[in-house]
């Protein structure tokens, strides 16, 4: 079995092409592949499959858990399909556990994905880490996000452990936590702790959650657009008048690996 390593703003993945849906993988095998010391090393694993004749992204976190959606991962998957000759450039759908997403993929350059409608789940949340507690926004991207705004991201600390988010019963399967600082140039600097992974260089669904939270925080009328600056590189997010998030950013494929020793 051949796996391909790729990333979107340094949020990295191992991809396997399985259009006939013959490949079954366990959580333990995903963990082995994604392990940065003994495996290939990545934030997540993507099985490129088909469902009802359309492309389907079977996404797993690095701990082997199943995730609904990954905004960086779906761009990297689209890049794979184009570069390996399985799909023509242009606009096409990819199905996910969070529903169908439509992507605009040029022959070269950044890839745009309509992430669908996002919404605030009302009710105050708090996030605590490094001895600090902030109130924040509960955002539903098909997967859960807690977004908090801080004066300085240095206050957040090392994020080696998951922040404590309350009320805990809002997130029975865990939550992605974004910490955001407004920069003088209008960009949003961000760090993220992803459930099932830890701190990552970027999170596509997280940047979309941050964009909506920023509009709420600043009482900005929609449509609105933001440049989000996670450690891995810049992403742009537009929130349209119907609260649909349109995410644009790069996707990179690097090299292929033989995965047989991990399976």
Where are these regions (language model features)?
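A glycine-rich beta-to-alpha transition motif near the start of alpha/beta enzyme domains, typified by
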Residues: 1-107, 146-263
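Short, solvent-exposed secondary-structure boundary/capping segments
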Residues: 109-116, 246
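Active-site glycine-rich loop that binds ribose-phosphate moieties when present
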Residues: 117-136, 158-160
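Glycine-rich beta-alpha junction loops
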Residues: 117-119, 141-145, 251
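Internal active-site segments that recognize and position negatively charged phosphoryl groups
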Residues: 128-155
């Amino acid at each position: 079995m051949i796996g391909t390593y790729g990333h979107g703003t340094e949020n990295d993945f191992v991809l396997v092409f399985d259009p006939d849906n013959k490949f079954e993988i366990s959580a333990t095998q995903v963990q082995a592949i994604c392990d940065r010391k003994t495996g290939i090393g990545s934030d997540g694993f993507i099985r490129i499959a088909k469902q009802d004749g359309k492309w389907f992204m079977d996404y797993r976190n690095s701990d082997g858990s199943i995730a609904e959606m990954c905004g960086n991962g779906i761009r990297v998957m689209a890049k794979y399909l184009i570069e390996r000759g399985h799909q023509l450039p242009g606009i096409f759908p990819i199905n996910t556990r969070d529903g169908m997403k439509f992507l605009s993929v040029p022959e070269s350059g950044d890839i745009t994905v309509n992430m669908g409608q996002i919404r605030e789940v009302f009710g105050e949340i708090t996030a605590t880490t490094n001895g600090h507690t902030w109130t924040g926004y509960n955002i539903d991207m098909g997967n859960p996000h807690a977004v908090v705004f801080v004066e300085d991201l240095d206050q957040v600390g090392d994020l080696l452990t998951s922040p404590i988010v309350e009320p805990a019963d809002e997130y029975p399967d865990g939550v992605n936590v974004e910490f955001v600082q407004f920069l003088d140039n209008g960009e949003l600097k961000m760090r993220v702790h992803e459930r099932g992974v830890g701190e990552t260089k970027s999170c596509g669904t997280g940047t979309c959650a941050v964009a909506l939270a920023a509009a709420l925080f600043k009482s900005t009328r929609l449509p609105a657009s933001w440049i989000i600056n996670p450690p891995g590189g810049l992403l742009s997010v537009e929130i349209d008048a119907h609260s649909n998030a349109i995410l644009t950013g790069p996707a990179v494929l690097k090299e292929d690996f033989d995965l047989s020793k991990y399976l």
